[in-house]
Each structure stands twice: as structure tokens, then as C-alpha cells.
Amino acid sequence: MRCFKATIAYDGAYFLGYAKQPNKLGVQDKIESALNALGIKSVVVAAGRTDKGVHANNQTLSFHAPKHWNAAKLFYCLAPKLAPHIVLKKLEEKNFHARFDAQKRAYRYLLTKNLKTPFLAPYIACGDYGSLDALNTALKQFTGKHDFSLFKKEGGATTNPKRAIFNAFAYKTFIIGHECVVFKIIGDAFLRSSVRLIIQACVQYSLEKITLAEIEMQIHNLKATIRTPIMANGLYLHRVYY
């Protein structure tokens, strides 16, 4: 068997998340079904499992295929079976593990105050976010290594809730005629819905609905003020570092 590394992008609006689902509507379901149609039976491992509605620009996968498959032939056969909602960007033969070998993961979140067309609604979140300075002040609280037990969705079990965030900041830009705030958060790994809970906390602070002290208390597992993640549609798994 040969091990392959695949880089894909996908539209999270068409899936119930990355992980396999009982109704077969997960990204993993689609990829494994496409491989199975080619006679390849393999579990597909992802660098990170995104939630329902979350997109990916550069998700990384690892899987195995029989030796008669090479990267060029497999790319040619597999890419059309994934389209249009999953795009196979790159495929190479590489002996690695997509999840365990990943060193850092970068997420981006797009948020605008006024969405001018419904056609962008699945891809840019809409809502007030206060001031850019306040957002960056709040984001700074999350850098470093912390126990993120109170920044994960219920049911997101893990044996080790400690994660390191290397960089977290926000900036403004225009995307298809919309002024947006783009959040960028880079960490070694993230718990379930952790990125969206972090961004929600920062937005609520910027809107003066919570204080920095309340954010710090939640980071230190003293009290959970933010329990509901910000909407999923603005979030993108942007890059995985190896």
C-alpha cells in the first residue's frame, strides 16, 4: 500500500461537518465513497475535523491506496468524483499522518456588519463586531498555552484540553464589495468549536457585553460566560503547517 497526502478545499455549506455522518453527509463520507468507487478502501484522516457549515481552503488528508496507483493517475481519477463542492488541489505520495504530524493549524473568520447579497450568506458571517482595537485587545488574551476546557462545545471530549495559540489578531479588508473584519488564529490544535467560542468572546467584549476579566476567568476555568459559539458560516480552515 502507498500513503498519499491530499490537499483539498471544500464548501462547508453542503456538508454536516468533516466527520462521517449516519446520513453520509460528511466531507469524509464523500471522499471515502469516491475512493471506494475507484476500488480503494481506506480510512481518510484529516488534519482537523470542521463543524457543520465550516469551510476549508487547505485541509490536509492522509490515506492509503494499492501500489498500482501513482499520484498523477489518482488525481486524474479522484478529482472529478469530488467536484464541485470538494476541490482536490494537490495530491502527492508521502508517508505521513495528516493529524499527528501537523504542527500548526490556521483558521480565518470573515465577519461583516452589512451583507448586501444573500448569495454570500453561507460564506461571510453578518453581525456587529464593535471596534477593531477592542477585538485585538481581547484576542491577545488567548495567546500562549491554556487549558481550553471552557472554550469547547459540550460533547467535544478530549483527554488533554491544553492547547497553544501562537498568534491571534484581526484586521479589516474588503471582500467582494463588503468591508469585513478577518480574524486569524494560529494554534497547535483546537478543541471542538473552540475557535468560534474564542471569536464570540472577543466580539462580545468589543460590543461591551462582557469584560476582559470575564474572558480571563473563562480562560482560567473559573467561570464560563460565553457558552454559544459564533455562527459557523464565516469560519475557514485556512492552512495546516507540517
Swiss-Prot record:
Pfam families: PseudoU_synth_1 (PF01416)
GO biological process, one term: tRNA pseudouridine synthesis
Residues the record lists as binding substrate: Y107
Keywords from the UniProt entry: Isomerase, tRNA processing
Active site per database record: D51
Gene3D superfamilies: Pseudouridine synthase I, catalytic domain, C-terminal subdomain, Pseudouridine synthase I, catalytic domain, N-terminal subdomain
Molecular functions (GO terms): RNA binding; tRNA pseudouridine(38-40) synthase activity
E.C. number(s) listed in UniProt: 5.4.99.12
Reaction catalysed by this enzyme: uridine(38/39/40) in tRNA = pseudouridine(38/39/40) in tRNA
InterPro entries the UniProt entry points to: PsdUridine_synth_cat_dom_sf, PsdUridine_synth_TruA, PsdUridine_synth_TruA_a/b_dom, PsdUridine_synth_TruA_C, TruA/RsuA/RluB/E/F_N
Taxonomy, superkingdom: Bacteria
Complex and partners: Homodimer.
UniProt function note: Formation of pseudouridine at positions 38, 39 and 40 in the anticodon stem and loop of transfer RNAs.
Membership in a protein family: Belongs to the tRNA pseudouridine synthase TruA family.
Record protein name field: tRNA pseudouridine synthase A
